[in-house]
């Protein structure tokens, strides 16, 4: 088991992000010490943390990540989500360019 700080370094998600993800029900600690309140994560949770970090880096919001994460085994569904995110990003870019003119 890894303390939250150790898991944070390995997953490249901040401690604050890990706490937020726990509150959102996206990545709960494997266990929490009842006496100290310390959060412990399993190495088996690293792939999920990496998926979450990748989705965040692509601009997905936390609520959308909650919808996309369970679809990770379905390649077609993930491709659709990525296509939609790409279209969103394109629209955001075009709106920003219009504001600059």
Predicted regions and their residues:
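Basic helix-turn-helix/winged-helix DNA-binding cores
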Residues: 1-63
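Short, charged amphipathic alpha-helical surface segments
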Residues: 53, 70-101
């Amino acid at each position: 088991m890894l303390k939250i700080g150790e898991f944070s370094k390995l997953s490249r998600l901040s401690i604050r992000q890990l706490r937020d993800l726990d509150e959102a029900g996206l990545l709960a600690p494997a266990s929490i010490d009842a006496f100290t309140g310390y959060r412990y994560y399993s190495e088996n949770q690293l792939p999920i943390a990496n998926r979450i970090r990748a989705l965040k880096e692509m601009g997905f919001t936390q609520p959308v990540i909650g919808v996309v994460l369970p679809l990770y085994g379905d390649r077609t569904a993930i491709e659709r989500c990525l296509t939609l995110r790409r279209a969103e990003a394109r629209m955001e870019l075009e709106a920003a360019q219009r504001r600059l003119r």
